[in-house]
Amino acid sequence: MNKKVIIFMLIWLFIVGSVYAQLPIPPPVVKPFADSRDWMLVETVEYSIGNSGVTIIVPKGFVTDFASIPQPLWSFGLSPYGRFSKAAIVHDYLYWKQDCTREQADNLLLIAMKESGVSRSQQSEIYVGVRAGGETAWESNRKDRAAGLIKIIPDDRLNFPYEINWPDYRKQLFDLGVKEPQTTDPSAYCSFGNSADVP
């Protein structure tokens, strides 16, 4: 092979690797449920908050709907899927666990969107949306947790049938007495949500 080609390939790999390494939240690997409304993480998602050295770990098996954006708003350029999707997974997880306050979770969403290169207008629209309408999801998650429902599927239950929707599978797991696996201590990351500034 020509030396120039090899040098070009090495430079290209370095550039691509550098760009990928700078992504605050790597692209998630997900498996859809039958209706493609809910998705299960096939691999753990890790988000390093700014330069803090602190990481939020969303475990494999967590079920997300990405961004809970009402369908009428999709025609205005906002859908559940976009550059903000990875930040939305972290936000869904924070809303589910509720170890942080709701405001901290919303601020961490905004920080993650800033670091993910989401446009300022979309950051504002999504942040205003979760501040105005997120209480319903927060309360729904609180009630589901109190009722013993899960949103993190244990390793031995990850291979769900492709024809099943999440609400049906969740009920099956509940009826079988399946519990969520233990997750990491959130105390290190919640305080970064006391402001919306990237640390």
Regions from the language model: what does each represent?
Residues 1-5:
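Positively charged n-region of N-terminal signal peptides that target proteins for export
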Residues 7-8, 75:
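Short amphipathic alpha-helical "recognition" segments used for binding
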Residues 20-199:
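Extended terminal accessory/targeting regions
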Residues 8-16:
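Bacterial N-terminal signal peptides
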